[in-house]
Each structure stands twice: as structure tokens, then as C-alpha cells.
Amino acid sequence: MEIIPAIDILGGRCVRLLQGDYAQETVYSPDPVGTAMRWQSLGAPRLHVVDLDGAADGESVNFELIREIANSALIPVEVGGGIRSMDTVKKLLTAGVDRVILGTVAVENPELVREICARYADSVAVSIDARNGKVATRGWVNSTEVDALELARSMKKLGVKRFIYTDISRDGTLSEPNFAAIRDLISAINMPVIASGGVSSLSHLRLLKDIGAEGAIVGKAIYTGDLNLKRAFEELS
């Protein structure tokens, strides 16, 4: 199972939010590129980079920083946040990004997801970001009545080959992942699923591996030191 460190960028800095709330940010580093190199040096197989400004604004805001991370890293970099056009997808992939993550556009413009997958299926993941089983969009600010499992099923039909599942209520809380929801998603679509939100211990990672998650995104716990990343790589990767 891939254990994927998260680097969330807001205002050019590496931050963590509590439950996706932009008013509750903690700055962990003024240097996202240096942070990326640190996680790589500990053995990360991949990096998960989120442009939080982009997620809120609907377009790539921290593009130059993201390109620098992608070009500096020797490991694959996946990027989400504000990717809502074919041009942005092309721009990121051309800049060296390995995988683009689509969120809002999956709800608001599924036809575009179909077009993106027709060209770049192996370089796409759709992020299912849920609050009480319902999908949230636009940097998790906008709540919808779209059911998380139904969205995943419809995206699979459009050619999506990989999913990320985030339980927003657990993100940044150091509580635990929503194991039941992740298990339900894996069994519903029978596709690779990467778990996110609340992953904060080795036992969480072992459980996610046991229920069949392809990977786990680790955020706040590696910045606070609650999760020893090097040990996690040694034991589970």
C-alpha cells in the first residue's frame, strides 16, 4: 500500500486546515518545496499536493510552486485543487505532474471528466470528498445532495480508473479514517481507492491495507509527529 504524504499549499506556504475550514489553518512551513524534499528523503513513494487557493478560486493559483515540486522530486507527484478545465490538466501534466485529481468538476461537469479520461485516463484520479455521505465541492465550501457512492459509480462509467475518498469531518482531526465508508466504496466500484482524512497512526494504516485501500494520504499526523513516517514506510510500503 502506498503511503502518500500531503502537501497543502495556501498563500505559497505549507499548511494544514481543520476539516477543510480555511479559517482554521496552521502553517507548518514557508517552504513547500523543501517539505516535499523532506518527505521524499524519508522514503515517500509519491507526493499528494493540493493547491488550496486553487480549490477555492477554481483555477490553478500556485502553479509555479507545483511545477518546482514536480521538477525537483524524483518520485511521482499528484496534484489537486482548482483543476476544472482541459487546459489546466494539460498544463500540469506538461509541467511534470504525474496525476491530476478532479473533484468539483466531477459533480459540475461530468462530460469534461469523460473528455479528460479519454485522453489521460491513467493520469487521472477523482476525489470523492464527503460530509455525512454527501459530496462537497469548491474547496469543500459548497455542500451538495450528491451521494458519494453514486458519484463514484457514475465516474467509473465515464472512464475514471482511480478514486480518492476523503471524509471531510475527519480531515485534520487526528481521529481515525472512516473505515466503513472506505470499505463500502471499494466494494461498490471494485477500483483502486486511496483513503484520506483522519489517518494518524500505524494501526490506521494497517487497517486500511487490510480492507483493500490502494493507498493512504497522510497529512496532519506527519506534521505534528503523531505518525512516524519513516517507520510507516518501512512497515507497510
Curated annotation (Swiss-Prot):
<comment type="similarity">
    <text>Belongs to the HisA/HisF family.</text>
</comment>
<feature type="active site" description="Proton donor">
    <location>
        <position position="129"/>
    </location>
</feature>
<dbReference type="InterPro" id="IPR006062">
    <property type="entry name" value="His_biosynth"/>
</dbReference>
<dbReference type="InterPro" id="IPR011060">
    <property type="entry name" value="RibuloseP-bd_barrel"/>
</dbReference>
<dbReference type="GO" id="GO:0005737">
    <property type="term" value="C:cytoplasm"/>
</dbReference>
<feature type="active site" description="Proton acceptor">
    <location>
        <position position="8"/>
    </location>
</feature>
<keyword id="KW-0963">Cytoplasm</keyword>
<dbReference type="GO" id="GO:0000162">
    <property type="term" value="P:L-tryptophan biosynthetic process"/>
</dbReference>
<dbReference type="Pfam" id="PF00977">
    <property type="entry name" value="His_biosynth"/>
</dbReference>
<keyword id="KW-0028">Amino-acid biosynthesis</keyword>
<comment type="pathway">
    <text>Amino-acid biosynthesis; L-histidine biosynthesis; L-histidine from 5-phospho-alpha-D-ribose 1-diphosphate: step 4/9.</text>
</comment>
<keyword id="KW-0413">Isomerase</keyword>
<dbReference type="InterPro" id="IPR006063">
    <property type="entry name" value="HisA_bact_arch"/>
</dbReference>
<dbReference type="InterPro" id="IPR013785">
    <property type="entry name" value="Aldolase_TIM"/>
</dbReference>
<protein>
    <recommendedName>
        <fullName>1-(5-phosphoribosyl)-5-[(5-phosphoribosylamino)methylideneamino] imidazole-4-carboxamide isomerase</fullName>
        <ecNumber>5.3.1.16</ecNumber>
    </recommendedName>
</protein>
<dbReference type="InterPro" id="IPR044524">
    <property type="entry name" value="Isoase_HisA-like"/>
</dbReference>
<dbReference type="InterPro" id="IPR023016">
    <property type="entry name" value="Isoase_HisA-like_bact"/>
</dbReference>
<dbReference type="GO" id="GO:0003949">
    <property type="term" value="F:1-(5-phosphoribosyl)-5-[(5-phosphoribosylamino)methylideneamino]imidazole-4-carboxamide isomerase activity"/>
</dbReference>
<keyword id="KW-0368">Histidine biosynthesis</keyword>
<dbReference type="GO" id="GO:0000105">
    <property type="term" value="P:L-histidine biosynthetic process"/>
</dbReference>
